[in-house]
Amino acid sequence: MNYSYPFSYDWSTQEIIDVIKFFEAIETVYEKGMEREKLMNIYRRFKEIVPSKSEEKKLCDEFEQASGYSSYRVMKKAKEAQNGDWIRME
């Protein structure tokens, strides 16, 4: 991993940590997979920090440019899945 995670200097240290946890979860879904409930809990916390759709899109686009991992596709798949499902990107 030779990239940095997008964040805002307006956030608290804990908020930055929680946003980074979200992007790390996206990486995990691509690399190993993750339980839907765990991913959704991490996403809910991310949305508490980033409630704006436009800011979410901006941050996720920056992350995808840097990493090649699509947060949008992961969350679309997770939202379509059922509780108990394992989410993994091919």
Curated annotation (Swiss-Prot):
Pfam families registered for this protein in UniProt: UPF0223 (PF05256)
InterPro entries in UniProt: BH2638-like_sf (IPR023324), UPF0223 (IPR007920)
Superkingdom assignment: Bacteria
HAMAP family: UPF0223 (MF_01041)
Recorded family membership: Belongs to the UPF0223 family.
UniProt protein name: UPF0223 protein GWCH70_0965
Organism of provenance: Geobacillus sp. (strain WCH70)
